[in-house]
């Protein structure tokens, strides 16, 4: 799997797998979720980096809601990637925060890269003419055999590089890949099926104690060995 060899976390609402996800996420067709970010959890997320290690995650919450709290130029902080709905929105966001996007398999050039329009305009026929673009690099684990996040970047995964000048692209996959690849269609969350869904369900059904998600996360990161890599909330979000 992509996450072989690294530490991962899951997050869910109480008895509600989508409870921490934004209601605005196009992949969330549950009708449930959160309309705001949990500030205590988000602060803990930024701090939850193993000693001499790196952490990264993704969020579907609009980047302008959290960008001022996540320093793109800071080291020793969890890298929060904005999961964009389209190539155009990914390109715009990438000027401020690290960005990723889900694409159909047909989008890739030679199977490894494409570009996202950053600037341009329309001609007198209404056609969009691109004048600038941002490079989109496909996740290497999608085309390299026996390759995982633990192998990526020699201990510095691409998604954990806050100062990168390119977007990371993922290919829509699974039973709902058509929905995932279409920003106009609701649904398609990869975590809503398979083994990820089993772990996500277990997280939502687990008994809640007095320890907050923020405290649990800090404790988890602190307990990992030096040099570890964490992918935070494989499923779930910062709400």
Task: Give the location of each predicted region.
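Class I S-adenosyl-L-methionine
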Residues: 1-239
């Amino acid at each position: 799997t992509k996450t072989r060899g690294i530490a991962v976390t899951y997050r869910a609402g109480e008895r509600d797998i989508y409870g921490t996800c934004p209601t605005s996420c196009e992949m969330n067709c549950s009708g449930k979720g959160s309309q705001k970010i949990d500030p205590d959890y988000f602060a803990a997320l930024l701090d939850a980096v193993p000693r001499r290690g790196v952490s990264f995650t993704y969020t579907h919450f609009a980047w302008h809601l959290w960008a001022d709290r996540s320093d793109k130029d800071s080291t020793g902080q969890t890298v929060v990637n904005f999961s964009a709905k389209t190539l155009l929105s990914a390109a715009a966001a990438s000027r401020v925060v690290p960005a990723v996007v889900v694409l159909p398999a047909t989008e890739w050039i030679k199977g490894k890269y494409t570009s996202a329009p950053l600037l341009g305009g329309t001609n007198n026929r209404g056609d969009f003419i691109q004048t600038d673009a941002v490079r989109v690099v496909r996740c290497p684990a999608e085309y390299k055999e026996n390759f995982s996040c633990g192998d990526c970047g020699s201990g510095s995964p691409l998604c954990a590089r806050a100062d990168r000048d390119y977007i990371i692209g993922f290919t829509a996959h699974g039973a709902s890949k058509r929905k995932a690849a279409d920003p106009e269609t609701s649904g398609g969350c990869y975590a809503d099926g398979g083994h990820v869904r089993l772990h996500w369900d277990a997280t939502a059904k687990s008994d809640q104690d007095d320890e907050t998600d923020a405290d649990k996360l800090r404790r988890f990161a602190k307990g990992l060995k030096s040099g570890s890599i964490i992918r935070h909330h494989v499923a779930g979000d910062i709400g």
